[in-house]
């Protein structure tokens, strides 16, 4: 059995304040923990410098979390100061280090940030933040969030605001916090050992330093290496000014030039989609298949689901206003709405119209005529995404692929029926390989190398480093073909692969509709299709698959389901005939990524137990509580940026400050969780903005696990949220408007100020 550490690895972290700098380091086996302080009260500079010299002399490796972006550049500056002193007395102050740290942080605000080249690092760095791709915006994850997902006993946030001059007692607290962070980083290091060893093996095998590459980058670099071996200079040109990336940039793309010639659709819906694609000339790839006006849909408008959009005119529109509107929306129309408010009626000259009456004395009385005010709206239809509806099943098209699904439905393979899921094997790579599609500047040789990597991967056992790197290489090319910083960049390649992938799956559906009576399409996704058929038609299904595979030169892989519990295309449970379970989206509680929110996992577990096993939600949750180790499944977490503050407001209005990253659980006690954000610019007089992160339930903070108690839990929260995940129930409106804590936390992470009060 492998050790839970690698020799010569040391875990470290630094903290910087104007009055104190701390450096904590521990060997990867957990031994030899050391702390060094340079502050207004003491200086461990000599011992600290000796530690760094030991690392350099003995070729040790330092492991951190975002250390390439912060910790090491600060250490590098300190080491440069010591080197430049050439043995002469050189007293380094905490304030100097603090300024270095702030400059390092500022460098990321104004650009890509200042980092030290790998070859210039005096001590080899391993950055867990980089390895796990947490520097990607979609996966951005802090060490504190990892502490939650690692189920750490204590989650500690930075105890003092940045820039504060700390007292001696606060310095002691900072040292304890620094140690805590190092031990949590050590914990995550052990979770990351497989990834680290994988990178070490690849680096040794291929002569490329993969140490801090994320998985996607490993795949891309491996493929670039293979291309350059075969065609030197094809990815990068070397000029007197340095290395220049080779790409194919296009002013526009004629989609008809991207389409393959093997489509023989019979369904008018798919014929219309193919023709729509063929008519498009695009100059960018993002958003080109969304928010499409009815007038621009062509025949697709006969089969698409559209929404009505409205734009209010300012006052009564003139003919010029209407003409301008109709020019933008040729099939649009104007609607007039009468309001409750009244206004004076005007004649054709814009003068008030009067109602004249004669009273009993013969006196004439004039009164302005009042009529209801009117508002005028320009209305038009548009497709939020390119789509067609085939026999009640909606197929959506996009740059990311096709998708469609039944919603809020249980589909079962009753006696005499089959549910079959067919996925295309390595779809995007094989579209390129089989149809000889390649980024123009890489030449057709690209396809030969792509095919060789694909075939080579199959020769290595699953789980091997070789198999893994080749899988990463196969999958990384497509996404990078639309990355303007990549040597794979050719947006026409991107569009050729994705559009033909979608049309190919449409052809699969078309063939099934023609050959298999009463076939029910359950789901359609980027690389596959799930259907329900009568068992008697299995031979017909097999014939369709064989015909389709021959036509499009792709291979299918199959799975058989006993039942599917579908909330929507992204959230469902599939029960295989062998008893295994596939979970997606809100139902997933196993195999979650480190960047994903792992709050209140008892909720999807309880919903699954009721749907698959017939165990009521209440019974499952009550039984789950009987095991003390299950307490983690009841905990949630939230985070707010340093510019905001998090408080718990008690019934009497008392505000209890909480740390910005907070673990908690719904409780009959405690208070409401509220986030206070800074006032908007120009509206400072209105004060802070308050956002209720959860106002339907009280909560109790639980950053220290010792504060948790099953006796204080509000079980109604867990019961209610699990019920919202039940499929095939009557409360579909509530289900689709699922605003539970877990989902709202995810929304809050994606957009900090998504709601205000």
What are these regions (language model features)?
Residues 3-27, 426-428:
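Gly/Thr-rich phosphate-binding beta-strand-loop-beta motif of the actin/hexokinase/Hsp70
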Residues 249, 297, 301-304, 313-320, ...:
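C-terminal, non-catalytic extensions of nucleic-acid polymerases
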Residues 17-39, 142-145, 149:
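RNase H-like nuclease fold core
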Residues 11-22, 454-494:
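Active-site cores of enzymes that catalyze phosphoryl transfer or operate on phosphate-rich substrates
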Residues 33-145:
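Conserved DEDDh/DEDDy metal-dependent 3′-5′ exonuclease domain
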Residues 125-127, 302, 410-428, 454-461, ...:
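Conserved catalytic palm subdomain of right-hand nucleotidyl-transferase polymerases, strongest
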Residues 149-157, 164-425, 508-549, 554-555, ...:
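Conserved "right-hand" nucleotidyltransferase catalytic core of DNA-directed polymerases
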Residues 69-81, 425-439:
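Short active-site loop/helix that positions an aromatic residue
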């Amino acid at each position: 059995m492998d050790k839970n550490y690698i020799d010569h690895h040391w875990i470290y972290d630094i903290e910087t304040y104007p009055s104190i700098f701390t450096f904590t380091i521990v060997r990867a086996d957990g031994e030899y923990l050391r702390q060094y302080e340079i502050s207004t009260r003491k200086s461990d500079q000599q011992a600290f410098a000796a530690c760094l010299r030991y690392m350099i002399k003995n070729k040790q490796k330092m492991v951190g979390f975002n250390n390439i972006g912060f910790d090491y550049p600060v250490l590098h500056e300190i080491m440069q100061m010591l080197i430049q002193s050439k043995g002469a007395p050189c007293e380094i102050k905490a304030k100097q280090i603090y300024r270095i740290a702030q400059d390092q942080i500022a460098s990321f605000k104004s650009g890509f940030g200042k980092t030290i080249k790998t070859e210039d690092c005096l001590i080899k760095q391993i950055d867990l933040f980089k390895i796990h791709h947490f520097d990607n915006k979609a996966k951005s994850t802090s060490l504190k969030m990892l502490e939650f997902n690692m189920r750490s006993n204590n989650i500690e946030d930075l105890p003092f605001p940045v820039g504060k001059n700390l007292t001696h007692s606060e310095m002691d607290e900072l040292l304890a916090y620094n140690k805590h962070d190092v031990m949590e980083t050590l914990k995550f290091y052990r979770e990351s050992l497989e990834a680290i060893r994988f990178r070490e093996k690849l680096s040794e095998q291929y002569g490329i330093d993969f140490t801090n590459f994320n998985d996607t980058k490993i795949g891309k670099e491996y493929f670039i290496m293979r291309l350059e071996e075969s065609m030197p200079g094809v990815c990068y040109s070397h000029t007197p000014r340095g290395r220049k990336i080779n790409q194919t940039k296009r002013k526009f793309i004629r989609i008809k030039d991207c389409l393959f010639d093997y489509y023989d659709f019979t369904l008018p819906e798919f014929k219309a989609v193919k023709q729509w694609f063929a008519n498009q000339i695009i100059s960018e790839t993002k958003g080109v298949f969304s928010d499409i006006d009815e007038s621009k849909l062509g025949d697709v408008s006969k089969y698409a689901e559209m929404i009505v959009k409205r734009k209010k005119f300012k006052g009564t529109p003139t003919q010029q206003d209407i003409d301008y509107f109709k020019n933008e929306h040729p099939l649009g129309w104007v609607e007039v709405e009468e309001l409750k408010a009244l206004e004076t009626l005007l004649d054709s000259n814009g003068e008030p119209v009067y109602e004249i009456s004669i009273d009993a004395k013969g006196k004439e009385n004039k009164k302005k005529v009042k009529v209801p005010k009117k508002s005028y709206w320009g209305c038009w239809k548009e497709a939020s995404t390119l789509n067609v509806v085939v026999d009640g099943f909606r197929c959506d098209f996009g740059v990311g692929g096709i998708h469609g699904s039944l919603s809020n439905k249980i589909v079962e393979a009753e006696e005499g029926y089959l549910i079959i899921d067919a996925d295309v094997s390595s779809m995007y790579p094989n579209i390129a390989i089989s149809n000889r599609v390649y980024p123009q500047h890489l030449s057709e040789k690209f396809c030969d190398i792509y095919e060789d990597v694909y075939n080579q991967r199959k020769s290595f056992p699953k789980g091997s480093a070789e198999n893994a790197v080749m899988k990463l290489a196969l999958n990384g090319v497509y996404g990078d073909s639309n990355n303007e910083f990549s040597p794979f960049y050719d947006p026409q390649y991107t569009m050729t692969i994705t559009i033909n992938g979608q049309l190919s799956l449409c052809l699969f559906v078309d063939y099934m509709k023609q050959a298999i009576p009463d076939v029910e399409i359950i789901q359609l996704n980027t690389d596959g299709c799930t259907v329900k058929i009568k068992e008697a038609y299995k031979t017909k299904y097999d014939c369709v698959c064989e015909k389709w595979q021959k036509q499009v030169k792709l291979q299918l892989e199959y799975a058989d389901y006993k039942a599917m519990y579908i909330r929507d295309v992204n959230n469902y449970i599939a029960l295989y005939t062998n008893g295994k379970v596939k979970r997606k989206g809100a139902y997933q509680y196993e195999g979650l990524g480190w960047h994903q929110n792992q709050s209140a996992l008892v909720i999807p577990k309880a919903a699954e137990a009721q749907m698959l096993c017939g165990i009521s939600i209440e019974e499952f949750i009550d039984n789950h509580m009987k095991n003390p180790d299950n307490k983690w499944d009841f905990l949630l977490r939230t985070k707010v940026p340093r510019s905001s503050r998090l408080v718990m407001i008690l019934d009497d209005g008392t505000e209890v400050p909480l740390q910005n990253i907070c673990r908690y659980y719904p409780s009959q006690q405690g208070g409401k969780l509220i986030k206070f954000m800074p006032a908007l610019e120009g509206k400072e007089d209105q004060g802070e903005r308050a956002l209720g992160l959860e106002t339907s339930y009280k909560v109790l903070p639980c950053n220290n696990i010792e504060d948790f108690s099953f006796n204080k839990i509000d079980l109604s929260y867990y019961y209610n949220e699990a019920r919202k995940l039940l499929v095939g129930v009557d409360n579909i409106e509530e289900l689709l408007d699922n605003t539970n804590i877990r989902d709202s936390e995810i929304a809050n992470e994606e957009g900090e100020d998504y709601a205000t009060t």
